[in-house]
Amino acid sequence: MAFRVGSGHDTHRLAEGRPLILGGVRIEHAKGLVGHSDADAVLHAITDALLGAAGLGDIGDLYPDTDPRWKDADSRLFLIETLERLNRLGWRTVNVDVTIFAQEPKLGPVKAAIKLKLAELLGIAADCVNVKAKTGEGVGHIGRGEAIGCHAIVLIEELTTEAQRHREDMRRDLT
């Protein structure tokens, strides 16, 4: 059985008039992240990490911000399509470790909700997901409250033929 590790990073600036979505969870805040899509830095970092682990490039290769199809797109779509791509290639997610860098808002109260949403989206147990939140301590664009960044590390494993068949059967049963 083969394992691979991937690392992803994303940063978006904050601006008024945008929703703040992190890890697929909408967070009440006066500002939201700016981007071509919904700018969910957590899902972008995880998607990038998964693509990297599988040797498939990065999120900009598959979902370029120059493509109007992705304007205001829900970042869950990027993650789900990436997971399906990995599954077709015989890989599954083992665990993910995420660090969110934000001066504001304070993320302690929403870390558990983000963790549960990520576990649901990734199709793994909640104890295989970790979410940490750090501030910028007043330093740089994150520390000044101008942006939010995220770093993600994922571990994927190659599925056995039997496990692949089981997942395909489960998917058919759901449709």
Model segments located where?
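C-terminal binding/interaction regions
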Residues: S7, N95, K106-G108, K115-L116, ...
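Short, low-complexity, charge-dense intrinsically disordered segments
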Residues: T161-T175
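Intrinsically disordered, low-complexity segments enriched in polar/charged small residues
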Residues: A49, E137, D169-R172
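N-terminal charge/polar-biased segments
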Residues: M1-F3, E157-L159, T175
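Aromatic-enriched hydrophobic runs in primary sequence
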Residues: E84-L86, G136, T175
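Short beta-strand element of the conserved SAM-dependent methyltransferase core
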Residues: I100, V154-I156, R171
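RNase III-family endoribonuclease catalytic core
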Residues: A2-A112, L121-L122
